[in-house]
């Protein structure tokens, strides 16, 4: 993976990135689903070790650490500015470690109860996606949990239609030229966005020894696309 992208916002400040993402119903909906599923599958954990893949500014780990006892939080990203913000985010964990690395090259011990992967898998080229899953697997304890947020799309035309539909559902007062450019570049990206079908992802995870425990389809909730297209948050358990 490379931070160099054909999507301009990834080359700008983190504030620009976060502000644009907050206007997306799929993004904000995924965060709500993430917390809802965490409340079910982490509620009985006394103290957890968390690894956050492609963590960005650490928001998802912070959301977990504010609600559950976290013994260690390991945050991995290839963007140094994002990691610096994560370091200063006052994450409520006994120990916080940040790792500046390509996620495919990181070597983690199988000591984590939870791996967070929110919109990270589709930034990995298709030929490397199995390796990404292997890195997740190697980081987890047996029976560990993967919280996976993903946008599933089987082909480029569906991806373009998804982002057009998304833009149509953003209120006019939030639909700035910057947001429109961001979504258009994301839809058309061929060097930072590698979306795949839900069937493709589920096959890889199942073959790696994961079992799907739960899921929430976040967006869209209408019938524009078939059931397997859109933004999902899923709970996977490592069983083998």
Please place each PLM-identified region on the residue numbering.
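C-terminal alpha-helical "lid/dimerization" subdomain adjacent to the S-adenosyl-L-methionine
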Residues: 149-208, 217
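A conserved beta-strand element that flanks and buttresses the S-adenosyl-L-methionine
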Residues: 116
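Short catalytic micro-motifs in class I SAM-dependent methyltransferases
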Residues: 119-120
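Conserved class I S-adenosyl-L-methionine
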Residues: 2-44, 59, 63
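Core SAM-dependent methyltransferase catalytic element
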Residues: 209-211, 217, 221-240
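A short glycine-rich, Lys/Arg-flanked "PGG" loop and its adjoining helix->strand segment in the class I
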Residues: 130-142
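Class I SAM-dependent methyltransferase SAM/SAH-binding core
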Residues: 51-53, 57-105
């Amino acid at each position: 993976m490379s931070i160099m992208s054909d999507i301009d916002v990834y080359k700008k400040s983190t504030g620009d990135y976060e502000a644009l993402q907050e206007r997306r119903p799929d993004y904000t909906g995924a965060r709500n689903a993430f917390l809802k599923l965490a409340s079910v599958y982490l509620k009985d954990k006394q103290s957890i070790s968390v690894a956050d893949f492609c963590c960005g500014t650490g928001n998802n780990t912070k959301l977990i650490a504010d609600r559950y006892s976290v013994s260690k939080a390991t945050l991995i990203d290839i963007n140094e500015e994002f990691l610096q913000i994560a370091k200063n985010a006052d994450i409520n964990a006994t120990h916080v470690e940040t790792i500046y690395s390509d996620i495919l090259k990181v070597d983690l011990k199988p000591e984590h109860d939870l791996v967070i992967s929110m919109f990270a898998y589709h930034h990995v080229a298709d030929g490397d996606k199995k390796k990404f899953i292997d890195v997740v697997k190697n980081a987890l304890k047996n029976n560990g949990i993967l919280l996976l947020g993903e946008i599933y799309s089987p082909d480029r035309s569906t991806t373009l239609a998804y982002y057009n539909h998304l833009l149509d559902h953003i209120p006019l007062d939030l639909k700035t030229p910057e947001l429109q450019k961001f979504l258009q570049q994301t839809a058309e990206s061929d060097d930072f966005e590698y979306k795949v079908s839900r069937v493709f992802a589920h096959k890889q995870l199942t073959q790696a020894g994961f079992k799907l425990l739960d899921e929430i389809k976040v967006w869209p909730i209408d019938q524009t696309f078939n059931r397997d297209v859109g933004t999902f948050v899923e709970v996977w358990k490592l069983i083998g």
